[in-house]
Structures are given as structure tokens and as C-alpha cells.
Amino acid sequence: MKAGIHPDYHPVVFEDSSTGKRFLTRSTATSERTVEWTDGNTYPLLVVDVTADSHPFWTGAQRLLDTQGRVEKFNRKYGRRVRGGQEG
């Protein structure tokens, strides 16, 4: 690899904003906010909306969508149209 063309890859703490869980990993992302980790070192802190700790795929929790409302909206917009005087 060429020297000087790659971003700095360093340890970063990510925090799930909905659960508050934090995990230490490596990333090129940076932040002005910092946090002291359990090992006594200080790392940049990035707060994110969704992680494996809160994502429905990983937690098994389901989110119900208003599919009935979407179907009705679709039918109103694109539903049965009249062609040449016949319903079709």
C-alpha cells in the first residue's frame, strides 16, 4: 500500500443512542467527543442510531408497519381505472 494516501485507522467507541450500549472497535471515523474506556484509555465517541444491539434483525423484535394504510393509498392512486368505458 502507498504511504500517506489512506485515512487513519484507529480505535473508536460507538454508542447506540436507543440502548446506551457502547462497544470498542476500529474505524476511520472521528469525533470531538471522547470517553474513557474500561482499559483506562480515552477514545473518540461516536453516537449512532442503530447497532446490532437495537436492530430488529439481531434482537428478534418486530416492528409492525401500517401496511393496510399503504395498500389503501396505493389503491386510491393506482387502483382500478376505467379504460374505454370498461372497468379493468
Curated annotation (Swiss-Prot):
One of its GO terms (biological process) is translation. SUPFAM superfamilies: L28p-like. InterPro entries: Ribosomal_bL28/bL31-like_sf (IPR034704), Ribosomal_bL31 (IPR002150), Ribosomal_bL31_B (IPR027493), Ribosomal_bL31_sf (IPR042105). The keyword Transferase does not apply. It comes from the Bacteria. GO terms for cellular component: ribonucleoprotein complex; ribosome. One of its GO terms (molecular function) is structural constituent of ribosome. Keywords: Ribonucleoprotein, Ribosomal protein. Part of the 50S ribosomal subunit. Belongs to the bacterial ribosomal protein bL31 family. Type B subfamily. This is Large ribosomal subunit protein bL31B. It comes from Nocardia farcinica (strain IFM 10152). The lineage of its organism: Bacteria, Bacillati, Actinomycetota, Actinomycetes, Mycobacteriales.
